[in-house]
């Protein structure tokens, strides 16, 4: 639920490397 400061509209979350995932076109962590 914490925004990672990255969008995932066109590309996957690079921040997935630290546990972020795409939700509603924005990368979140928990």
From Swiss-Prot:
InterPro entries: Cyclotide, Cyclotide_bracelet_CS, Cyclotide_sf
Pfam name, any one: Cyclotide
Disulphide bonds in the chain: 4-20, 8-22, 13-27
One BP annotation, GO: defense response
Coiled-coil boundaries: none
Linked residues for Cyclopeptide (Gly-Asn): 1-30
PTM section of the record: This is a cyclic peptide.
Record-linked SUPFAM superfamilies: Cyclotides (SSF57038)
Keyword Lipoprotein belongs to the record: no
Top-rank lineage group of the source organism: Eukaryota
Keywords, alphabetical: Disulfide bond, Plant defense
Domain notes: The presence of a 'disulfide through disulfide knot' structurally defines this protein as a knottin.
Family: Belongs to the cyclotide family. Bracelet subfamily.
Role summary: Probably participates in a plant defense mechanism.
Protein name, entry field: Cyclotide mden-E
């Amino acid at each position: 639920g914490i925004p990672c400061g990255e969008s995932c509209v066109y590309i996957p979350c690079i921040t997935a490397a630290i546990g972020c995932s795409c939700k509603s076109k924005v990368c979140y962590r928990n």
